[in-house]
C-alpha cells in the first residue's frame, strides 16, 4: 500500500537558518514557476526549454531583472521557504517607473509579520532621538571599517592578483575611524563615507592597474568596473533586505541614509559589506574580462565565504541592543553620558 505524500508545510523548508543560506539569485529573461513540486526557472534555447532548479531551502533572496515572470504558485513556495523576492532592472540596475524615478529594488517580504519584535522594540527605543540615531550610525560605520581590512587582504583576492598590503588598508581604515568618531552629525558622516569610498576606488585602481576611472551612478557607467559595481551592489542589497526581514526591522527606519528615504535601512545594512566584498571583486573581474555571470558567481562565492549575511545580522542586532541600552541609561540618568555618539563608537561609557 502506497501512502499519500504529506503536503509541504512552511516549517519543512526553513530548516536552514537564514544567516547560513548559501544562495543568492539574480535572474533575467526567464520564467519562475513550480514544476513537479519544485521551484524552477525556465530559459529558452531555440525551440527547447531548459529547466533549472532553485534550492529554495538554501536560498536567502532572489532578484528578478528584465524579462522575468513569476507564477503565483512559485511565489507561494518561495514565501513558505522565507525567500525574499526583489524586482530590479537589467544587470542589477535601478527600476524606473512613471511615478518614482529612482526605485532601487521593490521587495516582496516572504511571509506574515508574525516575527519576534525584540529587535524592533530596541530599534524604535532609540530611533526618535537624533543623538542616539547618530550613535547607531557611527557604530555601523565603525564595524564596516573593522571588517574591511581582512576582506581586502584575503587569500582569494591575492591569488586573483589583487595584492594590497595589510598596512595600507589598515591605515586607511584607522584614518576614517577617527573621522567617524568625531563626526558631529549625519551629514558629516555621509561626507566621510563618500570620501572613504572614493579612497577605496583609488586604491583598487592602483592595485589592479585599471587606468582612468570615475564612478558613474544609477547604471549610467559604460566601462566594466562601473557595470560590475552596480550589479554587485544589488546583491549586497539582497543581503541587507534579508537581514532586516530576519530581525523584523522595517526598511524605513534608517540610521544613515535618511529618515524619509524609502528602504534606507536596506542601504545601511548593505554598506556593511559593499566596500569590503563588491569593490575589489568588481575591479578584479573587470581586469580579467569576466562577463556578468562570472562576476556574479565570484561575488556570491565571496559573500558566502566571508559569511557576509551573518555579519550584517550580528551587527544590526548589536546596534539595536547597545543603542537601546544607551537610551535607557539617558532616560534614567540624564547627563550620565557626556558624548553619547563617541561612547557608542568606542564601546565605552563616559560619565559626566
Where are these regions (language model features)?
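Active-site helix-to-loop segments that bind/position phosphate- or nucleotide-bearing substrates
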Residues: 2-30, 37, 42, 80, ...
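A positional/architectural concept
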Residues: 7, 14-16, 32-63, 71
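Glycine/small-residue-rich interface belts in oligomeric ring/scaffold proteins
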Residues: 52-120
